[in-house]
Each structure stands twice: as structure tokens, then as C-alpha cells.
Amino acid sequence: MAPEVLPKPRMRGLLARRLRNHMAVAFVLSLGVAALYKFRVADQRKKAYADFYRNYDVMKDFEEMRKAGIFQSVK
């Protein structure tokens, strides 16, 4: 019996094939992470800022700081 011969591996274009596959996976993963960040972090942060400034009174905050003595030029 003759020993079984293994087929030769395809070496031509090996790096290009692997890079193409890995680039596609990296692109899809980066889009997923960007979407996840937008919905989990950015939108909640934007909502928190909007809620804060909806009820924020500048003059009330200024008067509290003035009474606490933070400003040197305002008596």
C-alpha cells in the first residue's frame, strides 16, 4: 500500500484571504460597538443633560454661590 498523500495547502493569496475575512469581522464588530455605545451611553447622557438644564435656574445657583462667598468681586 502506498502512503496516503496529503494535498498541498494553498499558499498563494493566504494573507490576502485572511485579511479580507478579518477586516469584514472587524468592520461588523466596530459598527456593533458604535451602535451599542450610542444607545447605552450617548443617548442616556444627552437625556440627563436635557433633564438637568430643563429645571436649572441660573440666578438661584448664582445667589447660592454668592452667599457662600465663592466670588470675591460680588458682595
Curated annotation (Swiss-Prot):
One of its GO terms (cellular component) is mitochondrial membrane. Pathway: Energy metabolism; oxidative phosphorylation. The keyword Transmembrane helix applies. It is found in: Mitochondrion inner membrane. Signal peptide: none annotated. It comes from the Eukaryota. Keywords: Membrane, Mitochondrion, Mitochondrion inner membrane, Transmembrane, Transmembrane helix. It is a single-pass membrane protein. Residues 55-75 are mitochondrial intermembrane. Residues 1-13 are mitochondrial matrix. The chain crosses the membrane at residues 14-54. One of its GO terms (biological process) is generation of precursor metabolites and energy. SUPFAM superfamilies: Mitochondrial cytochrome c oxidase subunit VIc (SSF81415). PANTHER family: CYTOCHROME C OXIDASE SUBUNIT 6C. Component of the cytochrome c oxidase, the last enzyme in the mitochondrial electron transport chain which drives oxidative phosphorylation. The respiratory chain contains 3 multisubunit complexes succinate dehydrogenase (complex II, CII), ubiquinol-cytochrome c oxidoreductase (cytochrome b-c1 complex, complex III, CIII) and cytochrome c oxidase (complex IV, CIV), that cooperate to transfer electrons derived from NADH and succinate to molecular oxygen, creating an electrochemical gradient over the inner membrane that drives transmembrane transport and the ATP synthase. Component of the cytochrome c oxidase (complex IV, CIV), a multisubunit enzyme composed of 14 subunits. The complex is composed of a catalytic core of 3 subunits MT-CO1, MT-CO2 and MT-CO3, encoded in the mitochondrial DNA, and 11 supernumerary subunits COX4I1 (or COX4I2), COX5A, COX5B, COX6A1 (or COX6A2), COX6B1 (or COX6B2), COX6C, COX7A2 (or COX7A1), COX7B, COX7C, COX8A and NDUFA4, which are encoded in the nuclear genome. Belongs to the cytochrome c oxidase subunit 6c family. This is Cytochrome c oxidase subunit 6C. It comes from Homo sapiens.
